Amino acid sequence: MELNGAKILYTIHTDIPFLGDFKITQTLVSTWIVMALLSGLAIWLGHGLKLENVSKRQAAAEFIVTRLDQFVHDNMGYHFDQYIPLIGSIFALSIGCNLISVVGLWSPTADLNTEAAWAIVVFVLIMYYKIKTNGILSYLKGLLDPIFIMAPINVLSEVSTPVSMAFRHFGNILSGTVISTLLYWALASLSHVLFGWLPGVLGDIQLFQIGIPAFTGLYFDWFGGCIQAFIFCTLTAIFIKRAAGEE
């Protein structure tokens, strides 16, 4: 039994200093597939909208937008409507990246680089609102409170926000992958112990691997993936709201 990270599928050699070669990994390919599928779904749901005689497709699109608006308003208020597309994009991308493993492709959320990229975007927005609300000088002065020797700890506290968000999402998704893999291996071993003595092909059939892994996959890939996407987006909304000085 082996647990490996994303494989490097292709390497583009460059002469750019400090950047090195550009590697095409499973994470990158799967992410682009998810983005292409989500873009196609959005185009399909959003075209041909009508004011009357609304189709089921349009009703589904309106339901998604309404629920997303309500989510942002409940967590951020009515002054942050410009972030509805961002929150919705992160939520959809997170769910898509979690569920793509169901069809046998590598899950981008099992790679820390994916969550780190999302967390960096959120961190930049948090810093933007803190500086916009308090001013650059007041923000820098706040890093020295209550005394200047606390500056390293205050800086670490600022950086810990995106780090904790990334590792929380990544850790929960990875743990689900590890548990599913261990269970699959354990069931294979159990099948071999109990039925390996049977003659011919019957002894090679992994009976305990039929059906049981599907239930764990249903939980970790579907339910768990949706919960983690919801938590990440909720934290994003709350942190941006607090950075803007809203209570």
Show the residue positions of the predicted features.
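Selective transmembrane helix interface/packing segments
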Residues: M1-E247
